Amino acid sequence: DQGEGHFVAKFRKHGVQAESRKREEKPAVIPVFATQFIRQSLQEQPAFLYENSGRIYAMQQPFLKLKDIRILRQGCQIGEVVKNRLEPHQHFYVSNAYGAGMKQCYEMDDAQCLSFLQGQQLPIAGYKGYTQMLWKGYALGFAKGDGMVLKNKYPKGLRIH
């Protein structure tokens, strides 16, 4: 039988290993507008905040720093920094850790819930800013109010038709 000719070798370097220069990691600075948004949104503030590639995460325990292991996501994603403002994320409003502590929320009836899940805006006055949308006590997502209507921020991939 004529094989493919694969070859494996393990090399060992003898001698003194030169110490590599380590880059000093600067701690990521959370933008002021992001901390203000969190302070305005939650009754109880998260203990730890972390920024990675413009995304802000929150946890009650310290974040793990494992340099050799790629960690996809730690904690709850609060939002993403876009053009000097924080664009909130769905995770923030539906998480068990932070969803129950939202300062501004609206309890929907069945008809409003169906409209919300379909991606429609709701004609509800009196709410300004981001509002958590609840149905029978369950957090489904969020909307942004301008005082006259709640504009739906439910993710397009989750909407029903």
Report each predicted region and the residues it spans.
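Class I S-adenosyl-L-methionine
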Residues: 1-5
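Polybasic, low-complexity RNA-engagement segments
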Residues: 14-161
